Amino acid sequence: MAITDVDVFAHLTDADIENLAAELDAIRRDVEESRGERDARYIRRTIAAQRALEVSGRLLLAGSSRRLAWWTGALTLGVAKIIENMEIGHNVMHGQWDWMNDPEIHSSTWEWDMSGSSKHWRYTHNFVHHKYTNILGMDDDVGYGMLRVTRDQRWKRYNIFNVVWNTILAIGFEWGVALQHLEIGKIFKGRADREAAKTRLREFSAKAGRQVFKDYVAFPALTSLSPGATYRSTLTANVVANVIRNVWSNAVIFCGHFPDGAEKFTKTDMIGEPKGQWYLRQMLGSANFNAGPALRFMSGNLCHQIEHHLYPDLPSNRLHEISVRVREVCDRYDLPYTTGSFLVQYGKTWRTLAKLSLPDKYLRDNADDAPETRSERMFAGLGPGFAGADPVTGRRRGLKTAIAAVRGRRRSKRMAKSVTEPDDLAA
């Protein structure tokens, strides 16, 4: 089952968690005090570059409908949409640049280039997801209401199509994001406030309608006036650009919470949760992937998902330097710092989806010690005296060491079993 006591699972005392919070608060203060012109210049240049890229893509599509120009224009437009959504829109709406007091680059005014309303995203993502990260029954991002991503979710027949559902979700990800705040499930079950639901539906329809008109009516009609393009060529290019953005966004976001090591939590964790426990839950419930400058930029710096969840309102261009200090904090408290290559992390999310399409009786691991979900019960065999300092080395024995010890014992049991089975056959 999911983690019910984050302190026990992390092998930390109350004093440890207070000290952890103080260290992470210090990192925040240092970044806030050093924010300035360099950061403002970064976001303004990023916005200018993104807009130039979008114009270039649309000019390419207007100039010619030949295959090379069409693909170049569609890819350019797709990349522009990725940058606008990932590095600009998502981060601006988190308030990362509100300190600049620029009315254009502000969380309260930015409307991003996708079918979902910024107002709805700020609630479902900034408030619900970031406050209740990976808490079952509270964070709707745990499976998005259609995917089984942990053994803690009861298997249902439609889960057999887990991989199919995520393929569909990836292709139309912007629509999944747009529909999330409508809470369609509650509406059908009669549990939604009718007036609030009507308001959300009107807001969704207005934004989605404008987006569909822009991408699939206005721009195709405009470019059809050019002798080198047709309405259909631009329409299909816009569809491809949106799918490119959708699939990439889905991949990056899924790498942040569904690879092995991204923990899940029960509702009881939120009762009187102090700041240190909130920090700890963000660290344990998130996962990074390794990235160079280009991949960092194209992921909206969400390759640093752990740091983003610790400091969602700090500028994205500072997360890389923050990650060095966060990793050091993890090492001091013997906490795992979950990361890996992009392809490995993304592959693990698909592996989890494939495995969990089956009922638990066909799975080897249990919900207390599985790749995608663990609980404090997995450490029952270590005994109460395990946490603390190693009597030989004097080093702290925390969560990372405890996980390694459990895995070591499990490997030893399997090896012993494989040795005894041939002996039994020989006898």
From Swiss-Prot:
Inactivation phenotype: Strains lacking this gene are shown to be attenuated in a mouse tuberculosis model.
Location(s), subcellular: Cell membrane
Other known facts: Was identified as a high-confidence drug target.
Species for this entry: Mycobacterium tuberculosis (strain ATCC 25618 / H37Rv)
Subunit details: Interacts with the electron transfer protein Rv3230c to form a functional acyl-CoA desaturase complex.
Catalytic activity: octadecanoyl-CoA + NADPH + O2 + H(+) = (9Z)-octadecenoyl-CoA + NADP(+) + 2 H2O
Pathway named in the protein's UniProt entry: Lipid metabolism; fatty acid metabolism
InterPro entries hit by this protein: FA_desaturase_dom (IPR005804), Fatty_acid_desaturase (IPR012171)
Post-translational modification: Is rapidly degraded by a mycobacterial protein degradation system that specifically targets the residues LAA at the C-terminus, leading to a post-translational proteolytic regulation of DesA3 essential activity.
High-level lineage: Bacteria, Bacillati, Actinomycetota, Actinomycetes, Mycobacteriales
Gene that encodes the chain: desA3
Membrane topology, record value: Multi-pass membrane protein
A single GO cellular-component term on record: plasma membrane
Co-factor note (free text): Expected to bind 2 Fe(2+) ions per subunit.
Binding-site residues for Fe cation 1, renumbered to this chain: H90, H94, H125, H130, H308
Keywords: Cell membrane, Fatty acid biosynthesis, Fatty acid metabolism, Iron, Lipid biosynthesis, Lipid metabolism, Membrane, Metal-binding, NADP, Oxidoreductase
Family per similarity comment: Belongs to the fatty acid desaturase type 1 family.
Function per UniProt: Is likely involved in the aerobic desaturation system responsible for the synthesis of oleic acid from stearoyl-CoA; oleic acid is a precursor of mycobacterial membrane phospholipids and triglycerides. Catalyzes the conversion of stearoyl-CoA to oleoyl-CoA by introduction of a cis double bond between carbons 9 and 10 of the acyl chain. Requires the electron transfer partner Rv3230c to pass two electrons from NADPH to its active site diiron center. Is also able to catalyze the 9-desaturation of palmitoyl-CoA to palmitoleoyl-CoA.
GO molecular function: acyl-CoA 6-desaturase activity; metal ion binding; oxidoreductase activity, acting on paired donors, with oxidation of a pair of donors resulting in the reduction of molecular oxygen to two molecules of water
Activity control: Inhibited by the anti-tuberculosis drug isoxyl (ISO).
EC number: 1.14.19.n4
Entry keyword Acyltransferase: no
GO BP annotations listed: lipid metabolic process; long-chain fatty acid biosynthetic process
Full protein name: NADPH-dependent stearoyl-CoA 9-desaturase
Binding site for Fe cation 2: H129, H304, H309
